[in-house]
Amino acid sequence: MVKHYAVTKPEVMLSRPAGPKKFALLEVEGHPCAQLLIAFTDSPDMEFCFFKDEKDGLWKLDWQQFARYQPQSWEDFVRGKGEGIGEFRVWMIRDRMSESRDDYAYRLIAPGMNGTNDRSIARPMVYVPKKSDMGKRLFMLFKMDEEMLHSPYKVLNANDDRGALRVRVLLSRSKEPNRKGEYSFTLVKLLGEGWYGLSAAK
């Protein structure tokens, strides 16, 4: 499966590091990991994730399992191109107007091609029944995020917009667009809280 990785602007590589900004150790699915946020002099902060290699015990920069990846271009997926289901790393923002309805409404925003300082142009909505297990779980995750208690991503979300929750989702797209040419989307599964995880979508 082709993986599209978020890339960094060329000028970032020419900018000098100003030093570590935040650092934290955590476990992802039982595997020791480290999150590092580094500030640069003339460019945006950069995120790094390291894992502890079980074979030699060394800490290594992880480019695959933990990096943001997607099976296809987010913009193409939202516009109806390619496979109709895929795993994505997104920010999820709750629509406050939906709190008085039967379903929660969430807007999904993917990182742009220049990393987390960029935002995707396409920002579809998904709807989740409040009384469903997923609806209850998302309610608790947003509540935890607001209270900043036991957040599963304490470091790398330092520069995120307030109220934007990082999640890994399995998303499906309708076969045909509506009269306006827009596709509808269904949140098939909430794969992870935060953007890092070893499990592949099944």
Give residue spans per PLM region:
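Hydrophobic transmembrane alpha-helix bundles
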Residues: 21-24, 36-40
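Short solvent-exposed beta->alpha transition segments
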Residues: 1-31, 111-123, 127
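Short nucleic-acid-contacting surface segments enriched for D/E, G, S/T with interspersed K/R
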Residues: 80-87, 129-170
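Short beta-strand edge/turn micro-motifs at domain boundaries
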Residues: 37, 42-101, 116-123, 168-201
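Short, ordered beta-strand-loop transition motifs
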Residues: 25-33, 54, 99-104
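OB-fold (S1/OB) nucleic-acid-binding surfaces
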Residues: 101-143
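Short linear motifs at secondary-structure transitions and domain/linker junctions
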Residues: 10-14, 23-27, 62-68, 83-87, ...
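Sterically constrained small-residue positions within well-ordered secondary structures
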Residues: 27-29, 41, 81, 160
